A protein has these predicted regions:
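Positively charged n-region of N-terminal signal peptides that target proteins for export
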Residues: 1-4, 19
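Short glycine/proline- and aromatic-enriched beta-strand/turn motifs that initiate or cap beta-hairpins
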Residues: 16-62, 147-158, 168
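Predominantly the C-terminal beta-signal and adjacent terminal strand-loop region
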Residues: 36, 60-62, 66-67, 111-168
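Short hydrophobic/aromatic beta-strand or adjacent loop that forms the aromatic wall/cage
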Residues: 40-42, 72-76, 143-147
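Gram-negative (and chloroplast) outer-membrane scaffold detector with strong preference
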Residues: 46-125, 152
């Protein structure tokens, strides 16, 4: 019974002091090839707690056709930290880890820095840049990327004290 109550309280706290978001993020890498070869696209769904967020990202490492076996689709977990905020602008840091399905270099790690603009409480735009690192059994590689994203938050979240008291 104690375990059940602990888990219930954990989930209640998780839901009470956070907000859900969805983000779409096109980007370009510095790889050789056509514009489609260099283009990436990802969709992220996650939760934000004050300055920390955790998202699950599904995407494509290239928008070019890859042949009979798709080796460009990936799934990634992306923790994000809002480092500094001034007005509607925020400096962000993201470190992610994921898996590229069917690829020889299937381990994906990511380091990203961004500048986010809060257009409204629910709609944010981000310009980001960083590196993707790919690793496999016999080889590894990395690419630099530059991208933009738009995030929609499903509710506004105000950080502050759990208990508030009105003064007269």
């Amino acid at each position: 019974m104690k375990l059940f109550l602990s888990i219930l309280l954990l989930f209640a706290g998780y839901a009470s002091f956070s907000q859900t978001y969805i983000s779409i993020a096109p980007s370009l890498t510095n790889t050789a090839g056509t514009l489609a070869d260099k283009s990436n696209l990802s969709l992220e769904v996650g939760r934000q707690w004050d300055v920390f967020s955790m998202g699950f990202d599904i995407g494509k490492t290239t928008l070019s056709p890859v042949g009979a076996k798709d080796t460009s689709t990936y799934l990634e977990i992306r923790p994000n930290l809002n480092i500094f905020q001034e007005g509607k602008f925020t400096n962000t840091f993201t470190a992610g880890i994921g898996y590229i399905f069917g690829a020889n270099e299937s381990l994906l790690t990511e380091v990203t820095y961004g500048i986010e603009y809060a257009y409204t409480d629910r709609l944010h735009f981000n310009v980001d840049f960083g590196n993707y690192y790919y690793s496999g059994k016999l080889s590894s590689s990395n690419v630099t990327f530059f991208g933009v994203s738009a995030a929609l938050y499903f509710g506004s979240f105000k950080s502050g004290s759990i208990i508030t008291r009105e003064t007269k």
